[in-house]
């Protein structure tokens, strides 16, 4: 499979689009990408999904924000804290685990280990006990 490089849109552009959608009656935003948790790394030099969410929760008219596809290595403590802080952000994480064996994960060129995945899940559960975690194995 061939994939291109990750490309993020500027926070202000996404917020402007969300405001326009809200003005037209949209109530829920679904942020989706091959790996949404990597948002902003290409533009800002660091994972910035938490910063984007902080801006999107201020958009009048938007009731829910759902985010799809979080890879474990980019689920930062700050992202978890931001998701836990706002009722508008759905407590739902779609995190492709793909495998629980470290050697197979290494052969698949994954950037995480089983132990790191468990640590992230524990942190999510600590901050958002009612969070739904969906995965593919």
Task: Identify the function of each model-found stretch.
Residues 10-15, 19-28:
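Small-residue (G/A/S/T)-rich helix-start motifs and N-terminal tracts that mark the onset
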Residues 1-12:
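Canonical Radical SAM [4Fe-4S] cluster-binding loop centered on the CxxxCxxC motif
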Residues 23-137:
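Conserved SAM/AdoMet-binding glycine-rich loop
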